[in-house]
Amino acid sequence: MYAENYKRFLELIEKLREFEGALIVEGLRDEVALRNLGVRAEIIRLSRLPLAEIALIASRYREVMILTDFDRKGEELAKKLVSYLEGYPCRVDVETRRELKRIAKKDIKGVEELYGLYMKVVSVSDPQLEGFQ
């Protein structure tokens, strides 16, 4: 990750921590990584149920964030989820995933690796990052 992206990466992690809706991830390792980052929001794992059921559960929340992996499969899952959620009144956030992918795709392939990357970023002693650690 380029040094100029460190601050934005940490801002996105803070956004995840403060998120109050439902986060949709692919599996248990993704959920564990997010919990390690301090995320307290409801986390729904795709590995447990069909997409239509996931969408129905997620639709009960005012806001839903899709946080699938950054590979082709994750991209396809995100698109399918967006289409399943279109008929529901919840707000769907895919921008956070897109921005994380843009910033971190050279370093990680998916959500389960976010915590490791976070630890690397906060270990960098940069005065501009003060207050984010």
Curated annotation (Swiss-Prot):
PROSITE patterns: TOPRIM (PS50880). The keyword Transferase does not apply. Pfam families: Toprim. Mg(2+) 2 binds at residues 69, 71. Keywords: Magnesium, Metal-binding. InterPro entries: TOPRIM_dom, TOPRIM_RNase_M5-like, UPF0292. GO terms for molecular function: metal ion binding. Binds two Mg(2+) per subunit. The keyword Magnesium applies. Its cofactor is Mg(2+). Gene3D superfamilies: 3.40.1360.10. Mg(2+) 1 binds at residues 26, 69. Residues 20-100 form the Toprim domain. CDD domains: TOPRIM_RNase_M5_like. Belongs to the UPF0292 family. HAMAP family: UPF0292. This is UPF0292 protein TGAM_1777.
